[in-house]
C-alpha cells in the first residue's frame, strides 16, 4: 500500500491587489460615505476587511442594526480624509497626509482612531508642535488619551507663552508644575574655584553664571538652597554669609561676622535658620537681627537632618524634632539602645533609625506614630555603614555595608542585594538622591605635616545599577530641585494666588 502526499503551495495575500479591488469597486460589498464639516468622501470596501480590522465595524456588522445589512452607510467622522487613509491602512497602504498640516493630521488621526476603537499609542504624537492658536485642540486630545508623563511633556512643549493658565484646572496645573521639576547637584569645584551644577543623569557639569570672586564655601552643613526662591546661601571660612539668586545670578545678601554655625537653612527669602552656641536662631537677613532664638541643652548631635520645616536632631538614645519656623520642640522619641543610623524619607514624611541591637524603627513625622518596628537580619549587619530610604519610595530601605548594597522591602520582607565593585572603607554617610543614584560622604586623613593629620570629607556619586561612580571635587554638594522649563515658574505663580 502506498501513501499519497499532496503538497499545497502557500502564498501571502497580495494587499496591494486587494486595495486595487477596493479602489475599482471590484467585489466590494459596502459603500462608505464619510462626512465631516468640510468634505464628503465616498469609498468602496469589503465588509470582511473592515470587520477584521477594527472594533467599530466589527460591532456594526455583527449587530441587528439596519447598517449591518445595508450596502451603503453614511458615517459622520472627525476628518473624512484621515478616516479614509486609516481604512486604506487596513489594506496595507501607507497614505501621506496630503494637504493637511502635519500637526492637524496627527491630532485628527487620534480622533479617528478613537472613533474606530483602535489602539492609540504615544508614537502617533511624536514631535508634535501645534500653532499657539490651536493649543486648545491639543488639550482636548490629551484629555482623550489620558494625562500621563508623555501628555504632560506635550503640553509643556506646546503651551503658548501668553496662554491664560487659569483656564486649566488646579489638578492639571499641579501635575504640570511637578513635571517641570527635576534634580541636580550644586557644588563648588575646588580645582576650578567656581560654582557648578551637575546633571545627575549624564554626569555633565557646567559653570553657574554667579558673581565672580565668590569665596570657597566652608562645608556642606554651612550651605543651603531654597528652591522656592532660587536662593543659594553659604558661609565661607571667614565667617561671611553669601546669599545668591541662581536664577538672576545676583548677590542678594553679604553679611560679615557671622557666629560659629553648625548648620543653616533658608526658611524664607529673608530668614535664615541657624544652629550655633547651644541654641537655634532665626536671623533676619534684612536687618541682621535675630527674630527668634531657642536655648537647648546640647547641639552636639550624632546626626541631624532637615525634613522640610522640621529639624531632626539625633542623640545617642533619643531623637528630637523641632519646627524651624517657630522654634518649637514637636516631640522626642526615646530609645533603650544606642542609635547607630538615622534617615528621613525623600518626601519628608518619615524618619527611621537602627539601634545597636539591630532594631529598626520607623515613625510618621506628622503624627509621631510608630509605623514599623523590626529586627534587621544578620546578613544585613556585617560591616554595616547605614540605612536610607530609597528615593521616592517609602516602602524600601537601602542598607549599605562595605561590600554590598541591600534593598529591603518593608511591606513584603523581600530583599535584594548587589555586591560592590569597589571598597567603601572610607564611607561615613550616604543619601539616596534618585531611584538608582546614591551620594556617598567619605572621610580620609591627610598629613600636611608629619605629626598633623587632617581629616577631610570627600564625596562620591554612584549608580546602584552598574556601580559606575564619579568623584566630586568638592566638600559641599547640594542635591537640589530646579525648573526644567519656565512654564513651571508661571504655574507656581498662578497656584500661589489660589
UniProtKB/Swiss-Prot annotation:
SUPFAM superfamilies linked: POZ domain, Tricorn protease domain 2
Residue ranges constituting the BTB domain according to the UniProt record: 28-99
InterPro entries according to UniProt: BTB/POZ_dom, SKP1/BTB/POZ_sf, WD40/YVTN_repeat-like_dom_sf
Any Pfam family matching the protein: BTB
Sequence similarity: Belongs to the mimivirus BTB/WD family.
Identification of the protein by name: Putative BTB/POZ domain-containing protein L788
Organism: Acanthamoeba polyphaga mimivirus (APMV)
Source organism phylogeny: Viruses, Varidnaviria, Bamfordvirae, Nucleocytoviricota, Megaviricetes
Amino acid at each position: 500500500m502506498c501513501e499519497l502526499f499532496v503538497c499545497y503551495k502557500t502564498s501571502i495575500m497580495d494587499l496591494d491587489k486587494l486595495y486595487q479591488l477596493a479602489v475599482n469597486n471590484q467585489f466590494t460589498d459596502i459603500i462608505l460615505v464619510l462626512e465631516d464639516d468640510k468634505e464628503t468622501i465616498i469609498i468602496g470596501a469589503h465588509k470582511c476587511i473592515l470587520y477584521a480590522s477594527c472594533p467599530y465595524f466589527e460591532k456594526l456588522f455583527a449587530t441587528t442594526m439596519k447598517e449591518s445589512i445595508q450596502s451603503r452607510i453614511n458615517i459622520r467622522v472627525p476628518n473624512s480624509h484621515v478616516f479614509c487613509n486609516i481604512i486604506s491602512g487596513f489594506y496595507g497602504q501607507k497614505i501621506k497626509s496630503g494637504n493637511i498640516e502635519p500637526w492637524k493630521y496627527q491630532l485628527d488621526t487620534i480622533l479617528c482612531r478613537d472613533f474606530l476603537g483602535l489602539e492609540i499609542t504615544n508614537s502617533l504624537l511624536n514631535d508634535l508642535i501645534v500653532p499657539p492658536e490651536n493649543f486648545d485642540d491639543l488639550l482636548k486630545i490629551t484629555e482623550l488619551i489620558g494625562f500621563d508623563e508623555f501628555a504632560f511633556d506635550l503640553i509643556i512643549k506646546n503651551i503658548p507663552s501668553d496662554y491664560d493658565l487659569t483656564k486649566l484646572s488646579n489638578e492639571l496645573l499641579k501635575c504640570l508644575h511637578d513635571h517641570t521639576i527635576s534634580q541636580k547637584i550644586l557644588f563648588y569645584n575646588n580645582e576650578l574655584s567656581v560654582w557648578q551644577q551637575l546633571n545627575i543623569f549624564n554626569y555633565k557639569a557646567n559653570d553657574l553664571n554667579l558673581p565672580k570672586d565668590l569665596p570657597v564655601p566652608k562645608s556642606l552643613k554651612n550651605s543651603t538652597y531654597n528652591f522656592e526662591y532660587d536662593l543659594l546661601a553659604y558661609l565661607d571660612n571667614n565667617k561671611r554669609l553669601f546669599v545668591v539668586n541662581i536664577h538672576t545670578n545676583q548677590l542678594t545678601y553679604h553679611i560679615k561676622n557671622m557666629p560659629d554655625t553648625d548648620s543653616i537653612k533658608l526658611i524664607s527669602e529673608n530668614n535664615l535658620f541657624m544652629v550655633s552656641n547651644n541654641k537655634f536662631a532665626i536671623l533676619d537677613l534684612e536687618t541682621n537681627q535675630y527674630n527668634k532664638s531657642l536655648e537647648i541643652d546640647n547641639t552636639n548631635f550624632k546626626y541631624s537632618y532637615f525634613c522640610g520645616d522640621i529639624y531632626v536632631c539625633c542623640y545617642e538614645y533619643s531623637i528630637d524634632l523641632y519646627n524651624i519656623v517657630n522654634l518649637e520642640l514637636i516631640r522626642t522619641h526615646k530609645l533603650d539602645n544606642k542609635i547607630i543610623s538615622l534617615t528621613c524619607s525623600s518626601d519628608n514624611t518619615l524618619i527611621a533609625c537602627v539601634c545597636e541591637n539591630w532594631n529598626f524603627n520607623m515613625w510618621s513625622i506628622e503624627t509621631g506614630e510608630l509605623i514599623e518596628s523590626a529586627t534587621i537580619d544578620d546578613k544585613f549587619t556585617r560591616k554595616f555603614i547605614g540605612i536610607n530610604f530609597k528615593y521616592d519610595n517609602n516602602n524600601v530601605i537601602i542598607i549599605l555595608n562595605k561590600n554590598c548594597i541591600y534593598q529591603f522591602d518593608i511591606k513584603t520582607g523581600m530583599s535584594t542585594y548587589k555586591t560592590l565593585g569597589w571598597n567603601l572603607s572610607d564611607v561615613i554617610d550616604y543619601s539616596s538622591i534618585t531611584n538608582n543614584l546614591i551620594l556617598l560622604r567619605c572621610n580620609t586623613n591627610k598629613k600636611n605635616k608629619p605629626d598633623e593629620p587632617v581629616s577631610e570629607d570627600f564625596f562620591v556619586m554612584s549608580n546602584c545599577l552598574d556601580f559606575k561612580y564619579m568623584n566630586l571635587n568638592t566638600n559641599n554638594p547640594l542635591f537640589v530641585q530646579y525648573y526644567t522649563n519656565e512654564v513651571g515658574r508661571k504655574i507656581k505663580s498662578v497656584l500661589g494666588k489660589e
